[in-house]
From Swiss-Prot:
Residues 107-321 are annotated as: Domain III, AAA+ region. The gene is dnaA. Belongs to the DnaA family. Residues 1-75 are annotated as: Domain I, interacts with DnaA modulators. It comes from Helicobacter pylori (strain HPAG1). Oligomerizes as a right-handed, spiral filament on DNA at oriC. This is Chromosomal replication initiator protein DnaA. GO terms for molecular function: ATP binding; ATP hydrolysis activity; DNA replication origin binding; lipid binding. Plays an essential role in the initiation and regulation of chromosomal replication. ATP-DnaA binds to the origin of replication (oriC) to initiate formation of the DNA replication initiation complex once per cell cycle. Binds the DnaA box (a 9 base pair repeat at the origin) and separates the double-stranded (ds)DNA. Forms a right-handed helical filament on oriC DNA; dsDNA binds to the exterior of the filament while single-stranded (ss)DNA is stabiized in the filament's interior.
Amino acid sequence: MDTNNNIEKEILALAKQKVSPIEYENCLSQLKYNPNASKSDIAFFYAPNTLLCNWITAKYGTLLKEILSQNKVGMHLAHSVDVRIEVAPKIQISTQSNINYKATKMSVKDSYTFENFVVGSCNNTVYEIAKKVAQSDTPPYNPVLFYGGTGLGKTHILNAIGNHALEKHKKVVLVTSEDFLTDFLKHLDNKTMDSFKAKYRHCDFFLLDDAQFLQGKPKLEEEFFHTFNELHANSKQIVLISDRSPKNIAGLEDRLKSRFEWGITAKVMPPDLETKLSIVKQKCQLNQIILPEEVMEYIAQHISDNIRQMEGAIIKISVNANLMNASIDLNLAKTVLEDLQKDHAEGSSLENILLAVAQSLNLKSSEIKVSSRQKNVALARKLVVYFARLYTPNPTLSLAQFLDLKDHSSISKMYSSVKKMLEEEKSPFILSLREEIKNRLNELNDKKTAFNSSE
């Protein structure tokens, strides 16, 4: 037996001692150690599917990290070890030559395609733009920037573009801004920048995820600026993904903001109920998990718009049913998902509410704090009041001061205005906007909680 198999067996044996036999059999036993990707400070594992990958990461990621950090298990490990779990790649038989093939599909995940992307009224525009870009021999728009909240399918659509381009034998580079930075620093230290430039500038499709993280890194922004210019000048397709629109990426150089807006910018909206139900059904089908119709409807209605959280809900129900040897019904689902339905927006600060509203409406926070006749600013101010009344203990006086309102009675009017749009008029736009702002608040509050717990 080779060393890598020994390492995998030793890791799993240690993990088996920490969990119940059923948990080990259903979850951890299916992990495969990936020696090629692993390094001294990071260990990579494969899981057989996306649902199990996400579940093990959330439920057992910390446990695996502790095991690897405290035991050598045949590896030359650093003091602190990170753990990454990915979906196992499908083995494909190539019908073409192998010349530079690995370089042409850098980091593209073949499980994300146009065929398994669930299309609804919330994302149809983004889907059509992405398909046109992927199918065209020359860029129809350049660059393309898709933006929106976490877990709405942006990364899926980016990989779908990459996979379609690969089918046409195009050279594709898909990278996160974090990995772009890491690679940049490595080549800079090794004085091999010519190799770095060749890697990222000689491709047909350059696909960048998390573009907002370029900001605040002058040397990286400078290199990306020149990479962008050369790709654009040579009519190579550039597609960017961000969690906010270019003008709202604080700290990003103006010249990059300008270039991001050269082509077309489209927002990925939160899914409506019908689309959410379609997503839940698809995730169940792909991972061979059978849920009753009423349970799938319950997930769509009560779990947030974040697709990853919906996946997590499906996994949680399935795994708990297996552990308890129980049949899946609505009562089980309600019990298992109780903690996922808690509103993390409770106790939000005024600053977080302001930021969440600003990001959702593509405004700057400073614009919202000043009274304006512009419709989008006026709506934003009303939404800040609405969410502040829902989620903060701040009295009317402090809220009025926060928004520079001289007439404190305006607070009640602004709150009532939003409530009317939601409850009486049932404006689809305002309803969708409310969910997006809540999702952003959840993310901001979760980040704060994680930061505080690490102190």
